Amino acid sequence: MVVIDHHRRMVNGIEPTIMSFLEPNASSACELVTALIEYFGEDSNITVHAAEALLAGIMLDTKNFIMKTGVSTFEAAAFLKKKGADTIAVKKLFANSIETYHQKSSLINSAHLYKECAVAYTEESFSEIRIAASQAADELLGITGVKASFVIYETNGVINISARSMGACNVQIVMESLGGGGHLTMAATQLNCSMNEARKRLADAIDEYWENNSQE
């Protein structure tokens, strides 16, 4: 088994492996895979579809080359472009249904500001709620003065919270206080409680975070 990942090694990581390529400073696993392909030279030709899939992964994890984007990220993208990756085709991979677009807009409209955080929620549920919530959380970061965004929604009787930031607020810490986890800029948790209780617990977690971390 081969493990290629841009996350830090976990205590209970995947074992045994014949090779582990872990680089937390990389933007994405797709960047690492691309680097390996490039390393092996001309003998490692890839199809256009494979190149587009790898470029899509890089664009997804970096939010279109905004988050965790380094020189090596652009070098990987340039290599994939040389291999025939079509950026228009990649863009189409992220197209939403009209229902998802409407739900994302509804979530954004429900948002309010709380201590430099944008918080949105919905009690409605539909098949692509996770996609809509994730995209809404990303877009809420575009509001002036917002350091983090949180979107609360329900699936199968469980309350979910998707959290995002640009780095000024460590949403991993906020979500860990609610039993979840993730990264500095992307995290999540699940709660077995009502929507109102989840909103209160999130507010308390935000309060606790800012009490322990001075606001700049």
What are these regions (language model features)?
Residues V2-I4, M19-L22, A118, F150-I152:
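Hydrophobic/aromatic beta-strand patches that form the interior of the parallel beta-sheet core
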